């Protein structure tokens, strides 16, 4: 592996993310209880007064709050519309997130497009440059159709909740880059 690739991998592992996982067939209270048990803290409580969205929260051993909020876009009874909202995560937290999702699934949670569920990943801006953000947008845009097909994403949900990268946005970023280089 060359030095540039090694540096890029190291930087990727420091990338912060926030993840939202939509599910139903589990109450927010039960989901928070499952999370608290998985984290080994046993700490979960109704935090709707502070967080809104009929939220229940669980805390991990690091004191981070993992929220389970109501999301009206999810199909099913209101008490079972549940969206996991993670604290800020890094590469080292991916296994924790994966296992928590498994624990929730074993507790009855369901998450697929037919239930109006999806996953949102928010990428932290720290450490990015205009060029790296352009690269990220271009990589995502070039793979969106493959991801949508592989995950069998519902086209109506894609047009409403998870739109693809707008080609005009990419053109504007490319134009800004060209103009910036000429200056």
PLM regions with names:
Residues 37, 94-101, 126-151:
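Helical (often loop-to-helix) elements that flank the catalytic cores of nucleotide-handling enzymes
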Residues 25, 88-90, 123-127, 155:
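Active-site-proximal loop/turn and secondary-structure-junction residues that shape catalytic pockets
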Residues 176-183:
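Conserved small/polar residues in nucleotide/adenosyl-binding loops
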Residues 1-107:
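Terminal catalytic/cofactor-binding subdomain
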Residues 112-128:
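Histidine-centered divalent-metal-coordination microenvironment in nucleic-acid enzymes
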Residues 49-60, 123, 153-163:
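Short proline/glycine- and acidic-rich turn/helix-capping motifs at secondary-structure junctions
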Residues 5-13, 152, 156-174:
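Extended intrinsically disordered terminal tails
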Residues 44, 112, 145-163:
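Flexible helix-coil linker/hinge segments at domain or subdomain boundaries
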